[in-house]
Swiss-Prot record:
Monomer. CDD domains: PBP2_transferrin_C. This is Serotransferrin-1. Abundant in liver and serum with smaller amounts found in the stomach and kidney.
Length: 690
């Protein structure tokens, strides 16, 4: 008995002593100087401990394996940490204050009076913060390769380091192979750590100051204020400027250093909360440790938590990722086939897309191939990553895609007469529909049940909720509607309460998902929600009632009459569904095809070619792009008569129009109405698309 009690007591003690370890943040450090600073932090704040590794790569491995929890990395290392074999994500960004917030400038610096510019760097000696780092390597070398100053055919020809060695006379690029020309100017072991005196921003500047190198690739703040007058910036146009002119003379503006960790929301919150709670210790000072930028950059002023869905790609942005890929030659080429990769959402769309691919085969290849994703947002991410090329989306999704750097290139036209003689921009009416005789009006919607095409979609959410927000100035729409179905909402939200799912009795993983398997998703889905009495009002497009009634609809709608429904007008009256031009919530832009700016030409030319063959009056009747058999509105809206090219250079704001942009800006005052993807795409001021 005593033995049992002793065992139990020891077990309790072990649990008691082990418990605090769960709350400890294990910080990974790369040098003895960082280790000293980390130990001083841990002495002040018991929730921190320190793990010493030789470099960033070893820290990334340690974090993946759970030996460490976090480290602050620059953009180049954030890219590496986010690769599939490591799977880490940025969770917290450094903020450098009003001038640059969560971004910083990458610049080229030389001593004043030296007679060369950025266009005449060949044969000079160079100082780099480190191999693969943003300001010190990726940006300057990427720029020199892009401008054809450094001649490099690609990794299959030779490593980029070899091309850089041929370009510069000698260099110090910590992390390069010891004994190579890239280590020739280094003062220590050429390691990518503070063991090398010329490592990092301060080290690269010291390399220049000591006369070892002619040019240093750093950030402006690396030049001490007292020494600015002795140095100049090298501008990309070949001119020079003062150090303080970095806003107009720089190589690029890049995302800030960020804390990375494993993909664990609870761990991310714990790390952030522990860091912001630190008192009596300056995280952003390296004074007294004989090195700079230890654990964090000394120029950081605060830390900002990132949206939970932010991954390395979204954090770094498409432009910076393209620069990194250009140095690794890992970007998708695909120029030889000219096939476009269409993104399909859900099984039904993938099935139609596969049929489109098969019918498009000619001369041994197809003009279309298919990628699939669970949601439109995931498709947008795939297009950004070059895993897909195009998708047709609603105006609200055009808005989000535009914020992420994509562009609208073709628009659905619903009037056949305008296909041959385009005039006014293609559009449709967003309407509110109720059952006739319900007594419901626009003025009496509060407390009722609502049916939406999807969260963030134009007719189904942005327009009606934007109008309601303008009336109430309240962002909590659950106070306005009692419940409803808005696919894409958080599970457990009142806006998921009325969703139907795929019809499975148990374990329905598609319930409330923004995809075709959710039977109340999209225009016809929202109308079905109203028909089956899951809601009192449906927010849809003006053509949906006539397309789904009077014998025109699917089986569930075969006995419906259009006269059994009515439109709710904003003035509190009701009208027959045929009076949409007089009774609507807004006239909005049609659905559009989105892609990356650089693939615009291919997407437009291939779609025009395929439309001539498979369009409404195409030459090949074996497949029709604008018809859906299994479900409605697959890939394109079934009411589409043709696709029309949007003039080159049209920004998403111009396509959506002033009224729609005003409605979106009003709705975006409600943070809950902004998707995590949009938040991630607009987090950095240097990544935002005007």
């Amino acid at each position: 008995m005593k033995l049992l009690l002793l065992s139990a007591l020891l077990g309790c003690l072990a649990t008691a002593y082990a418990a605090p370890a769960e709350g400890i943040v294990k910080w990974c450090v790369k040098s003895e100087q960082e280790l000293r600073k980390c130990h001083d932090l841990a002495a002040k704040v018991a929730e921190f401990s320190c793990v010493r590794k030789d470099g960033s790569f070893e820290c990334i491995q340690a974090i993946k394996g759970g030996e460490a929890d976090a480290i602050t990395l620059d953009g180049g290392d954030i890219y590496t940490a986010g690769l599939t074999n490591y799977g880490l994500q940025p969770i917290i960004a450094e903020d450098y204050g009003e001038d640059s917030d969560t971004c910083y400038y990458a610049v080229a610096v030389a001593k004043k009076g030296t007679a060369f510019g950025f266009k005449t760097l060949r044969g000079k000696k160079s100082c780099h913060t480190g191999l693969g780092k943003s300001a010190g390597w990726n940006i300057p070398i990427g720029t020199l390769v892009t401008e054809s100053q450094i001649r490099w055919a690609g990794i299959e020809d030779r490593p980029v380091e070899s091309a850089v060695s041929d370009f510069f006379n000698a260099s110090c690029a910590p992390g390069a192979t010891m004994g190579s020309k890239l280590c020739q100017l280094c003062k220590g072991d050429c390691s990518r750590s503070h063991k090398e005196p010329y490592y990092d921003y301060a080290g690269a500047f010291q390399c220049l100051k000591d006369g070892a190198g002619d040019v240093a690739f750093i950030k402006p703040l690396a030049v001490p204020a007292a020494e600015k007058a002795s140095y100049e910036l090298l501008c990309k146009d070949g001119t020079r400027a003062s150090i303080d002119s970095y806003k107009t003379c720089h190589l690029a503006r890049v995302p800030a250093h960020a804390v990375v960790s494993r993909k664990d929301p609870e761990l991310a919150n714990r790390i952030y909360n522990k860091l912001v709670a630190v008192k009596d210790f300056n995280l952003f000072s390296s004074d007294g440790y004989a090195a700079k930028n230890l654990m964090f950059k000394d120029s950081a002023q605060k830390l900002v938590q990132l949206p939970t869905t932010t991954d390395s790609f979204l954090y770094l942005g498409a432009e910076y990722m393209s620069t990194i890929r250009s140095l690794k030659k890992s970007q998708a080429t695909g120029a030889s086939s000219r096939a476009i990769k269409w993104c399909a959402v859900g099984h039904a769309e993938k099935g139609k897309c596969d049929t489109w691919t098969i019918n498009s085969f000619a001369d041994g290849e197809s003009k279309i191939s298919c990628q699939d994703a669970p949601t439109v947002e995931e498709c947008i991410k795939k297009i950004m990553r070059k895993e897909a090329d195009a998708i047709a989306v609603d105006g609200g999704e055009v808005y989000t895609a535009g914020k992420c750097g994509l562009v609208p290139v073709m628009v659905e036209q619903y009037d056949a007469d305008l296909c041959s003689a385009p005039g006014e921009a293609s559009s449709y009416y967003a309407v509110a529909v109720a059952k006739k005789g319900s007594g419901l009006t626009w003025k009496t919607l509060k407390g009722k049940r609502s049916c939406h095409t999807g969260l963030g979609r134009t007719a189904g959410w942005n327009i009606p909720m934007g109008l309601i927000h303008q009336e109430t100035n309240d962002c909590d729409f659950t106070k306005y509607f009692s419940k409803g179905c808005a696919p894409g909402s958080e599970v457990g939200s009142p806006f998921c309460a009325q969703c139907k799912g795929s019809g499975k009795a148990v374990g329905d993983e598609y319930r409330c998902k923004a995809r075709s398997e959710e039977q109340y998703y999209g225009y016809t889905g929202a109308f079905r929600c109203l028909v089956e009495d899951a809601g009192d009002v449906a927010f849809i497009k003006h053509t949906i009632v006539p397309e789904s009634t009077d014998g025109n609809g699917p089986d569930w709608a075969k006995d419906l009459k259009s006269s059994d429904f009515e439109l709710l007008c904003q003035d509190g009256t009701t009208q027959p569904v045929t009076k949409f031009s007089e009774c609507h919530l807004a006239k909005v832009p049609a659905h559009a095809v989105i892609t990356r700016p650089e693939t615009r030409g291919d997407v437009v030319s291939i779609l025009l070619e395929l439309q001539a063959k498979f369009g409404s009056s195409g030459s090949d009747s074996s497949f029709r792009m604008f018809q859906s058999s299994v479900e409605k509105n697959l890939l394109f809206k079934d009411s589409t008569k043709c696709l029309q090219e949007i003039p080159k250079g049209t920004k998403y704001q111009d396509f959506l129009g002033k009224e729609y942009m005003i409605a979106m800006q009003s709705l975006r005052k409600c943070s809950d109405s902004t998707s995590d993807l949009e938040k991630a795409c607009t987090f950095h001021s240097c990544q935002q698309k005007e």
